[in-house]
Amino acid sequence: EIDEEYAFSLGFRLVKGDRLFYTMWEPHQLSALPAALVLALYTAIAGTTTGALLFVRAVVLVCKAAMSAVFYRDFKQIIGRHGALLSAVVLFVYTPKWFLGPDYISQQFHFTVAAFLCFYHYYTHGFRRPWLVVLGAVCACFSFLAFPQSALAAAVIFIGMVLLGRRGKGPTICKI
């Protein structure tokens, strides 16, 4: 069980020059990659680390709001406006841990949901936006890096893509 300070410090250590699998041997070190990207951006702009944790929390909050908005937009036709709104609010307020930070469990959950939303939108909107597949794959990779056991979800996603491709509506890359 990790706490917010530990999760934050992993990304900070990468920004300051520690190297994965060389100077860092924590079991959660790969979950430091997204936090390190956000921290590097913040320190490059601000020139200091003062306020960095608040910035990371704000980025997570904005990402959660965007995912919730996409969820609402994509599911309001299927489950109705009220059901989609309630579900989107639950998605927004749900936090796998007690803090809004860059820990591996939160990353695994949010990146998996983001990958699902990308693939779902790509499928339901007629395979017209291939960049969503790329974005979904990047989100899935971050999910797998944050919590390597979640790579088992790749098999489920792949089977889903194959089954959707067999319906005859998908691109030939999904047909097996």
Residues of each region from the PLM?
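Transmembrane alpha-helices of multi-pass, membrane-embedded glycan-processing enzymes
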Residues: 31, 35-42, 55-70, 108-111
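Short acidic/glycine- and proline-prone juxtamembrane loop motifs at membrane-interface regions
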Residues: 100-109
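Transmembrane-helix signature of polytopic, membrane-embedded enzymes
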Residues: 66-93
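Perimembrane helix-loop-helix junctions
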Residues: 124, 153-176
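Short hydrophobic/aromatic helix or loop-helix immediately within or flanking a transmembrane segment
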Residues: 8-12, 23-48, 143
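Helix-to-loop transition at the C-terminal end of transmembrane segments
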Residues: 1-6
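Membrane-interface transmembrane helices that cradle and orient dolichyl/undecaprenyl
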Residues: 77-79, 113-133, 165-168
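Membrane-interface alpha helices of multi-pass inner-membrane proteins
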Residues: 96, 131-148, 154-161
